[in-house]
Amino acid sequence: MRIDIMTLFPDTLGDVLCESILGRAQERGFIRIETHQIRDYTANKQNQVDDYPYGGGRGAVMTADPLYRCWEAVCDEAGGPVHTIYMSPCGHTFKQADAIRLSKMENIIIVCGHYEGIDQRFIDECVDEEISLGDFVLTGGEIAAMAVTDAVCRMVPGVLADPECFEDESHYNGLLEYPQYTRPAVWHGREIPAILTSGNHEKVRQWRRKQALRRTRERRPDMYEKLDLSSKQDKKLLKEMEAEDA
């Protein structure tokens, strides 16, 4: 998979996207992440990429031409139109399901806005979807682009050592992840749950499932309401939870 990120600040992306899991995945050829300086596609000596907004108002708006030239160059290299995402507080909220969906694409482009945003005409002509990280505003799209890139890439086959690395994680299966513990067994007087050192893998699995259900119910009731808890095992765990809470 290849992800091309269009930005005014490519240096802010490199260190994060080339380290750890993503760095190793790029070295092994599972993913490729490229950044593109939008200023390189301007047609003026000042490399100006913004102008005053029509209708007045504070700030500046990124102009469509350099964005389009950059986008066109990336698409030409890919051999055709590429699914294009604009990071925007006006977009739909990014979910784990989006990460899974996008990870199945061969190429995507992520456009990072700045200032007061980008000319709507570029969005209308070139952007396939707008994505937001949540109900807040960032100075630019770079931080959001890094988050989306990381979430998408780790879903690409081969990037993580085993599917089990993400199958138990929060949001993948509609649940928040169960609590995790490591050595020492006692820290500041707090002991780990005894079940985790029992050696009984099935009981550990059931305990983790129960903790994930409990955590989701308490912290994300909106997610909990959507769960299918009709299995015999889940019904048993729910009864145990009710007894423990009584």
Residue map of PLM features:
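Short, solvent-exposed amphipathic alpha-helical segments in soluble enzyme
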Residues: 20-24, 100-104, 126
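S-adenosyl-L-methionine/SAH cofactor-binding core of RNA-modifying enzymes
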Residues: 63-114, 120, 157
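SAM-dependent methyltransferases
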Residues: 184-246
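Short glycine-enriched loops at secondary-structure junctions
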Residues: 38-41, 114-118
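N-terminal nucleotide/polyanion-binding subdomain common to many enzyme families
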Residues: 1-74, 202-225
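Structured adenosyl-cofactor binding patch, chiefly the S-adenosyl-L-methionine
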Residues: 122-169
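Hydrophobic/aromatic beta-strand patches that form the interior of the parallel beta-sheet core
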Residues: 4-6, 34-36, 83-85, 108-109, ...
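Internal, active-site/partner-interface "lid" segment
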Residues: 143, 155-195
